[in-house]
Regions:
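Beta-strand-rich solenoid/repeat architectures in extracellular/passenger domains
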Residues: 79-87, 100-111, 124-145, 157-169, ...
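Solenoid scaffold repeats with emphasis on beta-solenoid/beta-helix
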Residues: 55, 65, 73-75, 89, ...
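Acidic Gly/Asp/Thr-rich repetitive segments characteristic of extracellular carbohydrate-active
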Residues: 30-58, 346-374
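Glycine-rich repeat segments that build the extracellular carbohydrate-interaction surface of secreted
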Residues: 49-62, 73-80, 363-381, 389-394
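C-terminal membrane-anchoring or membrane-association module
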Residues: 499-515
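C-terminal low-complexity, Ser/Thr- and acidic/Pro-rich disordered "stalk" regions positioned immediately N-terminal
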Residues: 410-411, 454-485
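Extracellular beta-strand-rich solenoid/capping regions of secreted or surface-exposed proteins
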Residues: 62-74, 82-100, 107-121, 137, ...
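Sec-dependent signal peptide cleavage junction
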Residues: 21-32, 477-490, 506-510
């Protein structure tokens, strides 16, 4: 028995020694980050030893970190959460930082953010948030509210998300800085991205969503170019708001092809200040909402499409439409040299197109039978198929199928006339001239070119016998005696009178001869 016990003890000791000799595959207790396999007790220690390398989180950790100027690192969240030290920002970047992985960067203190950037940051993954946010509306911070991201450098977002539920603070402030959104999601209850004084915002992809009634997906006080992605207002707020409070910080916004704006657009001065004109231009993209120009706004709609209404809310607000397509008539805001026409099914709604006369002619000529065309403005000369109703409600000259169109309108028709050969009339049967008849519209024409319209009666040649049977006497030759006279009696009386006159004449002649 003792022999077996000693044997088992020897085996256990051997196994222990073998295990000690194996390379470590687990994480040392208390270490929270690693760089190239080397573990560190704090994330900051890992950052300080990771220039040009990747810091990987090994656990959830409460710690605030700073990336020094001139330093370049990648922070892989590794599925864990980095939460701030009390009363500090979670990450302060003065160098070059890439955030990646599926974890979170959180801040839980009032007046502090998950990321404050003074250098260059690429957000490729993860979630940046403020999980203890208490702001409920524009007047109530709840004692714990701030931006999730405060940018004073350059941020390029290619993935991940920045999310909060604040009704008091903007999600991202971009002030004197550049924010490039290529992919990823930004979402907040209030203002999502506040492009502040001298800020530059370039959006080529991704989503920016406001969920509150007082929110704005993008509030632009600087320069913003939207050429892709989606700005969205889902809770009754504004998808895109352009403002200006001081003309030295000019607000310039451009919406280009590829952009989608799901919600209303509002362009105006800050009501508490008197500033210069706010430039807002749409050259492409889709706006699923209203476009309103307020005080100081200079809105130019040169392309794209708008599904809502156009309007101004102040005398100083300017809105000019020179291109694009619209669900409601833009007639009130058309540029002087623009042509415009509405096209849709007869009795239905129309889509209104604005552009050069040549562009609108091309649009109009796509109309088919059963369509209605209303020309709002411009001189147009088009060829249309049968069955298109056209009205000219503007002051331009509109020619359709070589015929002028006025406010009374026309329904287009292409005559398909058949020639009817001439037929001689007989004594008893009427004939006809040669003519052309269009069965489609029931019209008659005297020439092959169909330029001389005639009536059906004009085609008839009366039967020859009809002329011979007409009475020679004219009305009123009968004596007015109360009844019809006998023609033979009157003839006899006339004969006797003639004989008597002749006898008298002969007697007078003999008398003159005798003398």
């Amino acid at each position: 028995m003792k022999k077996h016990a000693k044997k088992w003890l020897a085996m256990a000791l051997s196994l222990s020694v073998a295990c000690m000799m194996l390379p470590a595959v687990g994480f040392a207790a208390g270490n929270v980050a690693s760089v190239d396999g080397t573990e560190y007790a704090t994330v900051q220690q890992a950052v300080d030893n990771a220039n040009g390398k990747t810091v990987v989180l090994l656990d959830n950790v409460t710690e605030s970190i700073t990336i020094a100027k001139g330093q370049t690192i990648k922070l892989d969240l590794g599925g864990y959460t980095l939460t701030n030290t009390a009363k500090q920002h979670t990450i302060t970047n003065n160098g070059t930082l890439t955030i990646q992985g599926s974890g979170k960067v959180d801040n839980v203190d009032h007046g502090k953010g998950a990321l404050v950037n003074n250098g260059e940051v690429t957000i490729a993954g993860g979630t940046l948030t403020r999980s203890q946010e208490k702001g409920t509306d524009a007047a109530t911070s709840g004692g714990n509210s701030w931006y999730v991201v405060d940018n004073h450098g350059t941020i390029t977002m290619t993935g991940g998300q920045i999310i909060n539920t604040s009704g008091f603070s903007s999600l991202v402030r971009n002030i004197g800085a550049t924010f490039n959104l290529k992919n990823g999601t930004l979402q907040n209850t209030f203002i999502v991205l506040k492009n502040d004084d001298n800020g530059v915002f370039n959006m080529t992809g991704g989503k920016v969503v406001t969920t509150g009634s007082q929110g704005s997906a993008l509030q632009n006080w600087g320069k913003a170019t939207i050429s892709g992605g989606t700005l969205s207002a889902t809770g009754g707020g504004v998808a895109l708001q352009a403002l200006e409070w001081d003309k030295k910080y000019q607000s310039v916004t451009e919406v280009k092809a590829g952009a989608t704006v799901d919600g209303d657009v509002l362009v105006r001065q800050d009501p508490d200040y008197n500033t210069g004109e706010i430039e807002f231009t749409v050259t492409g993209g889709t706006i699923n909402g209203n476009v309103t120009a307020g005080a100081g706004a200079e809105v130019a709609l040169e392309g794209g499409s708008v599904s809502g209404a156009l309007g101004t809310i102040a005398d100083s607000g300017k809105l000019v439409v020179s291109g694009g397509s619209y669900a409601q008539s833009p007639a009130k805001y058309l540029a002087a040299d623009a042509a415009a026409a509405g096209i849709g099914k007869q009795g239905g709604s129309a889509t209104y197109y604005v552009g050069t006369p040549a562009q609108i002619e091309q649009r109009v000529e796509k109309a088919a039978a059963g369509d209605a065309v209303e020309v709002l403005q411009g001189d147009l000369n088009v060829t249309l198929p049968d069955g298109v109703a056209v009205i000219n409600s503007g002051s331009g000259e509109v020619i359709v199928n070589d015929q002028p169109v006025t406010g009374e309108g026309v329904v287009t028709h292409t005559h398909k006339a058949v020639k009817v050969e001439a037929k001689d009339a007989t004594e008893t049967e009427a004939g006809n001239i040669a003519y052309w008849y269009c069965e489609g519209c029931g019209k008659y024409f005297a020439d092959e070119a169909l330029t001389k319209e005639i009536t059906k009666d004009d085609t008839v040649v009366p039967a020859k016998g009809q002329a011979a049977q007409q009475p020679t006497a004219t009305p009123g030759v009968n004596p007015q005696t109360g009844d019809n006279s006998n023609a033979s009696v009157w003839a006899a009386m006339l004969s006797l009178a003639a004989i008597g006159a002749a006898g008298t004449a002969c007697a007078a002649y003999r008398k003159r001869k005798a003398q």
